[in-house]
Amino acid sequence: MTTPKKTAKTSGNEARELADLSEDIGIRFKYPNSERVYLQGSRDDIRVPLREIRQDDTYTAQGAEANPPIPVYDTSGVYGDPAAHIDLKQGLPHIRTVWLDERGDTEILPKLSSEYGIERAHDPKTAHLRFNQITRPRRAKAGRNVTQLHYARQGIITPEMEFVAIRERLKLDELSQKPEYAKLLKQHAGQSFGANIPTHPDQITPEFVRREIAAGRAIIPANINHPELEPMIIGRNFRVKINGNLGNSAVTSSLTEEVEKMVWSLRWGADTIMDLSTGAHIHETREWIIRNAPVPIGTVPIYQALEKTGGIAEDLTWDLFRDTLIEQAEQGVDYFTIHAGVLLRYVPMTANRLTGIVSRGGSIMAKWCLAHHRENFLYTHFDEICEIMKAYDVSFSLGDGLRPGCIADANDESQFAELHTLGELTDKAWKHDVQVMIEGPGHVPLQRVKENMTEELQHCFEAPFYTLGPLVTDIAPGYDHITSGIGAANIGWYGTAMLCYVTPKEHLGLPDKEDVRTGIITYKLAAHAADLAKGWPGAQLRDNALSKARFEFRWRDQFRLSLDPERAESFHDETLPAEGAKIAHFCSMCGPKFCSMKITQEVRDYADKQKAQRQGMEEKAVEFVKKGAKIYS
């Protein structure tokens, strides 16, 4: 796979860049020795992706022994499918349109509902940046509720629910019946801290998914205006997911680069993407991203609302924010971060903090509350926000605007006061059948991480928790993907459903593509460690396959089975670049004479030989007795 090339960062080049989008920017990639395959659901249009990693044979004295392919969860969309036709200017196939039409509870609007959306659609200055395929938005019919939570509570299993059940199961129910997978599927018992983790893959059914959604313990972020989406689920009783952030700023990054960065994030395994753009052309950037995104897209609408006021928080109004919500909902945003828990009375609680309010959205709303000495309009208009959300099936990501920005401020009065308010708002959203997840910290020392999960489960009624790390120490700028990855693995084990990645540039600057890659791989690792710890069925399959390949010196399979095959191979080749080294029974760490695994294999061979000799002697002894035990015949 080719690393995407850098693009110019000047708006004057945007038209040329967009014209070249589908040409040669590295949007198609090939994973080594693997392919994207599809599992068939109960109907022809439910085709669920996974990736199968093929392995080489193991060669022994007895001959070749086949190693079975290893299925892994895949987020790459069409970009990881060599057979797919990709044209970013056309967008992705609309795989959900038939499902939406069949339900009969939505209508196609004659035009956009948002004043700002209409204005941008007719602005000649942005015509060259506009996505080519303008479609009319879809909205719930009057009096209808179109959320996955509403359907689940009605006892309805939607195609989206069946899709995610198959996707989470990864056909492990089928593989568990095959003898060649018996050893590979062995795993340690997990500790789930009271979660309802399935104990066997065959328990991961569409009905199980429906029950978890109906209980509010899981969400399927799936805006009805995002028909390109390959549905996924976020919940404590499913695989831990990760989110990758992108977005332009007033300082750097272009529209084209954000589209590339989105595809790049999918290549490394992001389950969702948040577009946090704060610079120019936010509306156009988001449209290009959504139309080409097979994963859920989240935003923080207050960022764009603030841009519309020229950056003056005091000038924000409910009407402006409401129009922004509708604008983004009609584009297809799947979840909104809404900082409705930052209440006026909580702001003074942060005065004695070491780092005060560090959330951008939280600080915007705190400033508005203080400037007007009025309650947060996101809180006072929350029911109206719910009405918008349920008309498009946009999920809430209730923002932690008062999250701690350093470990000194962790778990303080203001943080938990806001969390308890988020629980109140969760209950209110559920009365509208709107899906909800809860955002969490932040910066928390390791010994206080579990308390955050306990508080969230208790006060937010087991709604999915979505945390930024947390970072467990503040002494490592440049390495905060590691400081946060430690906290992420732990809180994922305790029950967090989705982890928001942190890159090495955290606190220092806007991440580039390599930072995104490092952040995502770090968080895929943390999420996987959490799945192992909580006992997710089949979580250890990939570990066992890689360990077997390592013991048998199948170097290429080690690379293929790793989270970052390119990096694993490049590190190996730094010291042993010759092609023959990839079949050698040693590495540069110990060399050929001191390799512990090679010595272990020799010990095993010796033991097998001794066993064979003993068995032969025993057989001869039995034969001797049968023949009368005579020394001379």
UniProtKB/Swiss-Prot annotation:
- For substrate, which residues are the binding ones? N245, M274, Y303, H339, S359, R360, G361, D400, G401, L402, R403, E439, Y466
The keyword 4Fe-4S is assigned to this record: yes
Entry cofactor note text?
Answer: Binds 1 [4Fe-4S] cluster per subunit. The cluster is coordinated with 3 cysteines and an exchangeable S-adenosyl-L-methionine.
Give the GO terms filed under biological process for this record: thiamine biosynthetic process; thiamine diphosphate biosynthetic process
What's one GO MF term for it? zinc ion binding
> Could you say which residues bind [4Fe-4S] cluster here?
C587, C590, C595
Q: Does the keyword tRNA-binding apply?
A: no
EC number(s) of the enzyme?
4.1.99.17
Sorted keywords for this record are: 4Fe-4S, Iron, Iron-sulfur, Lyase, Metal-binding, S-adenosyl-L-methionine, Thiamine biosynthesis, Zinc
- Primary enzyme class: lyase
Which residues bind Zn(2+) per the record?
H443, H507
Gene Ontology cellular-component terms for this entry are: cytosol
Source organism superkingdom = Bacteria
Cofactor section: [4Fe-4S] cluster
Family per record: Belongs to the ThiC family.
Which NCBIfam families did the record assign? PRK09284.1, PRK13352.1, thiC
Role noted for this protein: Catalyzes the synthesis of the hydroxymethylpyrimidine phosphate (HMP-P) moiety of thiamine from aminoimidazole ribotide (AIR) in a radical S-adenosyl-L-methionine (SAM)-dependent reaction.
Q: How does it assemble?
A: Homodimer.
The molecule here is called Phosphomethylpyrimidine synthase
Query: Which species does the entry assign this protein to?
Result: Neisseria meningitidis serogroup A / serotype 4A (strain DSM 15465 / Z2491)
Q: Which gene encodes it?
A: thiC
